Every structure is written in C-alpha cells, then in structure tokens.
C-alpha cells in the first residue's frame, strides 16, 4: 500500500503498486491451481483472492492494451508503454541483450546477421486460431496453400513464416524461405537456416543495427495478463459472471478473433 502508482524520470521501471498487485495475483492463481489440480482440493478462496487482486490492478485505470501487438516487443517501446506493468529494464550501450541475433536466421534484417538459436515448433504455430475462432483443423477458412491467412493477427507478428515477406539487408522485402536443408546442422548458418523452418519476430527488431546489443525491455507483467488472470480466477469461483467474457474478449478483439460466448462455462 506504500508503493506509488507511477514513477517518473530515472525511477521509471521500479516496482509500482500495480506490479506488486500483479505479483500477488499471480501467486494466488498458482496456489489455487496447484491446490485444485494437484491436490484435488477446494480452492475457492484462493481463486477469489486472485481475481480480487487482478481487479484492483484494472481499477487503477493506469493500464490498457496497445493497439499494435508487435509494438510491445520493439526497442521503441522502451518508454514503458500503457500495457507494461513491470519489465526488466535495458539501456542502450549500457545494459543489453542478444535476442534479435538469437531469434533470426542469417540473411534477414538490416544487418543480415542471425544465429537461428530460438526456433518455434510447428505445433506452436498451428495452435493459433482462425479468424472465426476455430482451430485450423475445424475451420473451413483454413487453406493449406495459404496457411497464414485468416489467422489470429498475432501469428504474423510473432513468427517469421515461410513465404511471408521479410526485411533484407538491401532494404527490400522478399519472402522468407527456409533453406531446403534447414534441418541439417552443417547448414544452420546458411540463408534461412533454422531447425524448424520458423523463426521469431517477437523481441526481434529487424530494423535494429545492434542485433547483439538490443535494449528492448523484457516484459514481466502486461495488462493483457491482468485481464486473463482476472478471467481465469473469476471463472473458477463464479462461473458465468459477465466480467469473465468482458476481460477475455478485450484480448481476443486485439487479436482479430471473435468474442467468446456469454454463456461459456468454466469447463470450456
């Protein structure tokens, strides 16, 4: 209760009231989940407390969802934008990390440098819904010849996908095509190299020249998680509460997905 709601100047990034409330909400959610799903015991009061703490963050009226999901993971977002509640703070030329070079194959971005160290799996890519809210296995919108179309808007902003135009060192945008031998270790550093054929755009700034010294902050708690903690906890102890749908649908709307049904039960 003694923490300030916001900081200014050099103190931006320190623990705020919202960050403390989020940490507590997260802890109560974990305790409730463990008690219910591992110990098989009633956890109603823990769910209730998790929801109450998340609601306190919402009621601060300090946070909101950024319109552009991709913006959250660029160096330009180091102003600790309205969605960020707590982030690991980095500073250009003083405290940096190497995520851009680790997330890219060679031949992309303004530098063309990349180590292809982090490669998402096909299962993860396939888990992103279609714009009708169905999976790729259920939706009539899914087209195997154009698998990235009519998908959750976050898909193309999170992953470097085969066939999708990507920034090149000469300033052009041409399709990213994994190397035919991308699963051969000796070709891993070749153009398009990568173990799975997919790479990350999240926390990867292709316009950044210092790819091995990025100062993009790493978000620990965002407002999107506040909404989802609130919805999950509330759903466990008070199913069909209208606030559940309200919270979930804010996140889905930004992703270009249809809202969940107001009669959605807590097992769905």
What are these regions (language model features)?
Residues 1-103, 115, 132-268:
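Acidic/polar-rich alpha-helix caps and helix-coil junctions
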């Amino acid at each position: 209760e003694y923490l300030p709601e916001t900081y200014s100047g050099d103190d931006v990034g320190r623990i705020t009231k919202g960050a403390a409330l989020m940490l507590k909400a997260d802890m109560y959610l974990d305790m409730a989940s463990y008690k219910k799903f591992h110990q098989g015991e009633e956890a109603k009061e823990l769910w209730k407390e998790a929801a109450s703490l998340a609601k306190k963050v919402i009621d601060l009226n300090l946070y909101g969802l950024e319109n552009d999901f991709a913006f959250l993971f660029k160096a330009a977002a180091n102003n600790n934008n309205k969605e960020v509640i707590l982030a690991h703070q980095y500073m250009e030329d003083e405290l940096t990390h190497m995520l851009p070079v680790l997330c890219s194959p060679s031949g992309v971005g303004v530098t063309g440098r990349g180590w292809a160290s982090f490669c998402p799996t096909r299962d993860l890519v396939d888990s992103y819904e279609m714009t009708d809210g169905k999976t790729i296995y259920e939706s009539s919108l899914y087209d195997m010849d154009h698998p990235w179309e009519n998908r959750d808007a976050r898909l193309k902003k999170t992953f470097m996908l085969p066939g999708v135009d990507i920034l090149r060192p000469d300033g052009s945008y041409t399709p990213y095509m994994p190397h035919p031998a991308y699963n051969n270790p000796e070709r891993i550093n070749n153009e398009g190299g990568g173990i799975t054929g997919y790479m990350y755009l999240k926390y990867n700034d292709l316009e950044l020249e210092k790819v091995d010294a990025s100062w993009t902050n790493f978000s620990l708690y965002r407002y999107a998680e506040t909404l989802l903690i609130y919805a999950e906890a509330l759903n466990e102890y008070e199913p069909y509460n209208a606030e559940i749908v309200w919270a979930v649908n804010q996140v889905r709307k930004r992703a270009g997905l249809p809202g969940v049904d107001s009669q959605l039960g807590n097992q769905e």
